[in-house]
Structure formats: structure tokens, C-alpha cells
Amino acid sequence: MCIRDSAWVGLTEDEAKAKGIAVRKGLMPWAASGRAIANGRDEGHTKLLFDEQTGRIVGGGIVGTNAGDLISEVALAIEMGADTVDIGRTIHPHPTLGESVGLAAEVAEGVCTDVAPPRKR
């Protein structure tokens, strides 16, 4: 059995839906993270949720090593009303687990070059 760290702040997808907020999701799998791969712990992910109307972050979660230590950037982004561009263009050191927050924002914005873009439905 594997016990992973997990942390969440803000709204979940279900909570946003219940409040009538359409969200855009940015999911960064740690299998594409150089630091997670180097640590041998690439089974996690970072997920950010952005309000479709305003572009502002409304929630985010991290599953993986040190998730509780990494979630503070997401909490600050929510408090500051950050959007995908604010988070994605913030310098994140490489290779770190924390850069997955910036990359998840880039995924939501559609500009991330580290993972394949999500399929259109």
C-alpha cells in the first residue's frame, strides 16, 4: 500500500459546479516533472481550477510528496485573485516540485510545452 501526501485549498470541481461556476482545469502530471522523476516519486499531480469567466484561480490540489508544503502557493494565488497568466509567468525554479504549480497554470492557459494539450471534446 502507498500512502501519498495530498492537499487541497479553495473549491473542488463539484463545489464549483454546485455554485454555478464553470471551471477550466490545469492538470500537471508529475510523470512530466524532472524533480519528481529524479526523486523516484513521479506518481503525483498538481491540479488547478480557474473560473472560465474571470480566469481567476478558484481552487487547487496537489497529490504527491510534500503536497502540504507545496499548497501554500496555491492558497496565496487564490487570496490574491491570480489568473493563469499571473501564475504561469511567475518564475518557478527548475527542477523543483513547486514548478508544477506554474506548469499546471500553463496547461490551463494552453501554453504548456511540458505535456501534451488536453483533447478537445
Model-identified regions with their sequence ranges:
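Short, small-residue-biased leader/transition segments that mark boundaries at the very start
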Residues: M1-I3
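Flexible, glycine-rich terminal cap/loop adjacent to redox cofactors
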Residues: D5-R121
